[in-house]
Amino acid sequence: MSRESAGAAIRALRESRDWSLADLAAATGVSTMGLSYLERGARKPHKSTVQKVENGLGLPPGTYSRLLVAADPDAELARLIAAQPSNPTAVRRAGAVVVDRHSDTDVLEGYAEAQLDAIKSVIDRLPATTSNEYETYILSVIAQCVKAEMLAASSWRVAVNAGADSTGRLMEHLRALEATRGALLERMPTSLSARFDRACAQSSLPEAVVAALIGVGADEMWDIRNRGVIPAGALPRVRAFVDAIEASHDADEGQQ
């Protein structure tokens, strides 16, 4: 009934999958130091950290909170995992990431697929749309998608350089992750980040041109599209761009 016990249960689950802290950090976007603090119960973890760890491990939302109050965190974690819908592919592939090291590219492909399976599993257990935490969880899963996309892109580059035959499958995983990211944004259709993401796709303009229009860099563009983090000075231009593209798109549809 403490952070130490809850963290120990999380660590045991990680180790049972033969994941290092670095593996979990790559899967969650949380620093290894932050994960170490959580597993040791050294500090009270931030809510977003807990959500990322739950998502990365494919655990139901609220798992960590349940472990904090459980008389036997290990037994409670086992119960929660057993209660999840069976997904043997995800479990097998997640284990394969570290254990079945036939080649570097096989590991990278397995890891990309495990990430996609884990994200889909989390989406299946999202809170109700009426929940106060619904948008927070959506943004958390989008962040996981973005992280997984960047890893898959790097994996594809490694596979190409190695002349591996997994490049096609990695590209399929990357496209699936991007489709998932877009679908998650569609769950918040009125948010400015979702509207901006749609506008970027509908405009047919190169990203560099859109960035020049609103006066931000490429990294800031990505943050706006996924996290809604908009520099104060760019906010009027972002809104103007979105309004212009939406009006043009609506006019085009009206003529069809």
UniProtKB/Swiss-Prot annotation:
* Example GO molecular function: DNA binding
Q: Kindly give the Pfam families that the UniProt entry links to this protein.
A: HTH_3 (PF01381)
Q: Which residues form the HTH cro/C1-type domain?
A: 10-64
Q: Tell me the disulfide pairings in this chain.
A: none
Stimuli inducing this protein: Up-regulated 12-fold 7 days after infection of human macrophages.
Query: Which keywords has UniProt assigned to this entry?
Result: DNA-binding, Transcription, Transcription regulation
Whereabouts does the entry annotate DNA binding, in residue ranges?
A: 21-40
What name does UniProt use for this protein? Uncharacterized HTH-type transcriptional regulator Rv0023
> Which species?
Mycobacterium tuberculosis (strain ATCC 25618 / H37Rv)
